[in-house]
Amino acid sequence: MAIEQIPEHNTVLFVWFNHYAGVLIKTPSETIIVDPVDVKPRSFPDADAILITHEHYDHLDQRLITNIQKATDCVIVADPTSARGLQHSIPVEKLKQVRSGDETKIGEVSIKAEKCNHPASSPVTYIITSEDGVKIFHTADSLPFPELAAIGEREKFDVVFCTVGIAPGATPQTGFEIARLTKPQIAVPYHTNSNTYQREFANIIKKELPRTSCLIPEQNKIYQIGKRM
């Protein structure tokens, strides 16, 4: 699942690698993994950072995180609850706890935690801004919330990952509401094992949000996305 090629200028590469929120993102200089579960540690021979959104089974696998960190010496960025669970297995200098509003850097890549509307202890979503300014919004398995409109207006996202299933209350319609509020260049339906749900999301986007493109991802396939011009 490693991405061998280097992204072109003003682009990033990504892979969706499970039925949940597992996304591998590669910028020109950094490799970032979000919410890895249901994969082997050797799937990620290179990593600069792992981002954890919350402690639920489909987002946090403590043993997997520990093994990847030992193999790659990467930084772990996690919500407070997940960070507490990892504090005895991850070196203190490699574990960064974040709450909504916190921002950190992985090299020249910015990672900003934002609110998450999901029934977990202290969940977050992540805005990932590449060194070229490509903006990705990883929304964990959040349901829509009003503040997304202001976040979208401020950030001008190139891509937003939108949950369409396998989470309390999540449907193609709630995923569309995230896209409607954030108005990205590209909306990606994920956190589902149903291609029917993904297609339903795409149909709503086409009808209701014509300025946003929908990318239905295949698992373990590499996609390139570019900066909004």
Predicted regions and their residues:
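Metallo-beta-lactamase
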Residues: 128-185, 189-196
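Active-site metal-binding motif and surrounding structural segment of the metallo-beta-lactamase
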Residues: 38-82, 154-161
